[in-house]
Swiss-Prot record:
Keywords: Periplasm, Signal, Sugar transport, Transport. GO terms for biological process: L-arabinose transmembrane transport. The keyword Transport applies. Involved in the high-affinity L-arabinose membrane transport system. Binds with high affinity to arabinose, but can also bind D-galactose (approximately 2-fold reduction) and D-fucose (approximately 40-fold reduction). Belongs to the bacterial solute-binding protein 2 family. It is found in: Periplasm. Residues 1-23 form the signal peptide. The record marks C87 as: The binding site for the sugar molecule has not yet been established, but C-87 may be involved. This is L-arabinose-binding periplasmic protein. It comes from Escherichia coli (strain K12). GO terms for cellular component: ATP-binding cassette (ABC) transporter complex, substrate-binding subunit-containing; membrane; outer membrane-bounded periplasmic space. It comes from the Bacteria. Induction: Induced by arabinose. Transcription is dependent on the transcription factor AraC, the cAMP receptor protein (CRP) and cAMP.
Length: 329
């Protein structure tokens, strides 16, 4: 009996030790589509911080395309990872990612971009941590209106140029949120003009804005709405080309890190500022949720909306970027 008790104790001790070893050696992946982007570098940095705080190792892998994504999941499984956070290079890879992860009994959390199935429908069964697109758009509209009032513009001589990309869900929700906030603040709906861009970059938005400007020679002051910094910058460049002064243009982008060189210019331009989201929150929160799911069996909510955003302008951008771990960019 004495021997039997000792054996039981040894088994119990081994179980405890193996459990603590699992916690000690727990590995979780964090896969991103564009590792060269400051946004994703910050997500990785704060995923590492979560790992340090909670006691797990973060395996960071760049996944710029579908093939590399599926290979990365194989590598994670080979290294003993129990799950991963991913910003996919293509939302349509969702079904393949989930199937492969299931095959290895790995947990998956999507960050920044939601998976869609083969029919293009959102895969809302996969937990998602994402910027609150509508709320950030609303904030853009509110800040534009506030700055317009500060400058004392005559509303009758002012208009909104909304550079849209409605085929992209995030873009549509941001620009719609912005226009709705402007209307709610009292800006006349009939003076809100939408123009679609062929691409969400400076050249695409520049062409779209030019086509709008020639249609409205009566407008003396423009508010520029776009889904990111580049679309707003394209709009600002177009107004400069048409002879508008910086004081008659207010553009507020979304992203922040792409606005640094513009906000650093010696002279102010029509690009007033940008809404800087929170890659630090995305990186830490998604990793923490994955850890709790794997280590404690606490299933994360299907949708976690991140609303933390700060307006950066020429006056505060260096300090605010530093706070987010994006300084020196």
């Amino acid at each position: 009996m004495h021997k039997f008790t000792k054996a039981l104790a040894a088994i119990g001790l081994a179980a405890v030790m193996s459990q603590s070893a699992m916690a000690e050696n727990l590995k979780l992946g964090f896969l991103v589509k564009q590792p060269e982007e400051p946004w994703f570098q910050t997500e990785w940095k704060f995923a590492d911080k979560a790992g340090k705080d909670l006691g797990f190792e973060v395996i960071k892998i760049a996944v710029p395309d579908g093939e590399k994504t599926l290979n990365a999941i194989d590598s994670l499984a080979a290294s003993g990872a129990k799950g991963f956070v991913i910003c996919t290079p293509d939302p349509k890879l969702g079904s393949a990612i989930v199937a492969k992860a299931r095959g290895y009994d790995m947990k998956v959390i999507a960050v920044d971009d939601q998976f869609v199935n083969a029919k293009g429908k959102p895969m809302d069964t996969v937990p998602l941590v994402m910027m609150a697109a509508t709320k950030i758009g609303e904030r853009q509209g509110q800040e534009l209106y506030k700055e317009m009032q500060k400058r004392g513009w005559d509303v009758k001589e002012s208009a909104v140029m909304a550079i849209t990309a409605n085929e992209l869900d995030t873009a549509r929700r941001r620009t719609t949120g912005s226009m709705d906030a402007l209307k709610a603040a009292g800006f006349p709906e009939k003076q809100i003009y939408q123009v679609p861009t062929k691409s969400n970059d400076i050249p695409g938005a520049f062409d779209a804005a030019n086509s709008m400007l020639v249609q409205h020679p009566e407008v003396k002051h423009w508010l520029i709405v776009g889904m990111n910094d580049s679309t707003v910058l394209g709009g600002v460049r177009a107004t400069e080309g048409q002879g508008f002064k910086a004081a008659d243009i207010i553009g507020i982008g979304i992203n922040g890190v792409d606005a640094v060189s513009e906000l650093s210019k010696a002279q102010a331009t029509g690009f007033y500022g940008s809404l800087l989201p929170s890659p630090d929150v995305h990186g830490y929160k998604s990793s923490e949720m994955l850890y709790n799911w794997v280590a404690k069996d606490v299933e994360p909510p299907k949708f976690t909306e991140v609303t933390d955003v700060v307006l950066i302008t020429r006056d505060n951008f260096k300090e605010e970027l530093e706070k987010k771990g994006l300084g020196g960019k």
